[in-house]
Amino acid sequence: MNVFISVVLFLGSARAASKTGDDEWVHLPNKCEVCKFVSIEMKSAFDETGKTKEVIDTNYRFLDDKGAPPIKYVKSDIRFIEVTENVCSRIMQYNLHKERDGSNRFAKGMSETFSTLHNLVNKGVKVVMDIPYELWNETSAEVADLKKQCDVMVEQYEDVIEDWYKGSQEEDLTTYLCEKHVLKGQDTGCLKETWAGKKGDMAAIAEDKKKKKGKKKKGKDGEDGQKKEKKVKKKKKKSKISDSESSKRRMEAAGFTSDEEEIQKKVPLNQPKTEL
């Protein structure tokens, strides 16, 4: 017999809260938080696109003078444009974690609150909310606003980001963009906020699983490489043996032998003396 427990949770939706002006539920991101995640995602995008050794033909380097020699993709204007145009779409991968404070409320992965609610539903518990179940995984008002502000900030500070990109890039992008330009003379406290995670945090658990999976894959690749190396060595050894055997057969067919015992049989050492 299935027992259904009714869990009534009065969580106002972001849309309803914004209409009523209820600041208790909706905390839109401030300038510091926007710059923090813009710089984080931009650094991540540059890291991902900086591993290639691809060379670009000068015909596609339309921002530079014509006739210049081919350039590396990692130094190209194309890479810069691709990163700046797509960086804000990466913000949509974030979710709102209401159980966290400050800028830490924005993070990838499902929030602890909604992970708990999904688990209850999967166990047959009836969860009653004023947000329909179909909208549980919809983008929150806060994340949507984060993306909107990201678009404006990237466009406004494109020249600053380009100066960093075309420079030595020795200085951290968050420091260069946020502390020295976007938030110059303003509060930069959110830039130092970090989330260590806590026991049972589903987002932290998911991140740990990804890291472990990556390590296992690395180890497996190493083992596969060792196995392949052993197989190659065995094949080489077999080929050497087969080569020596085939050469021996060819010599025997021609009437020659390299076997010491056969030589002793064919040419005995103790032959009878002959007189001249």
UniProtKB/Swiss-Prot annotation:
Cystines in this chain? C32-C190, C35-C178, C88-C150
**Domain of life from the UniProt record:** Eukaryota
Residue ranges annotated as compositionally biased, kind Basic residues, are 210-219, 228-239
Where are stretches of biased composition, namely Basic and acidic residues?
240-252
Q: For the Saposin B-type domain, which residue ranges apply?
A: 30-269
Q: GO: which molecular function terms?
A: signaling receptor binding
Any coiled-coil regions, as ranges: 137-162
- Compartments where found: Endoplasmic reticulum
Q: Which PANTHER family match?
A: CTG4A-RELATED, PROTEIN CANOPY HOMOLOG 3
Name recorded for this polypeptide: Protein canopy homolog 3
Q: Which organism is it from?
A: Danio rerio
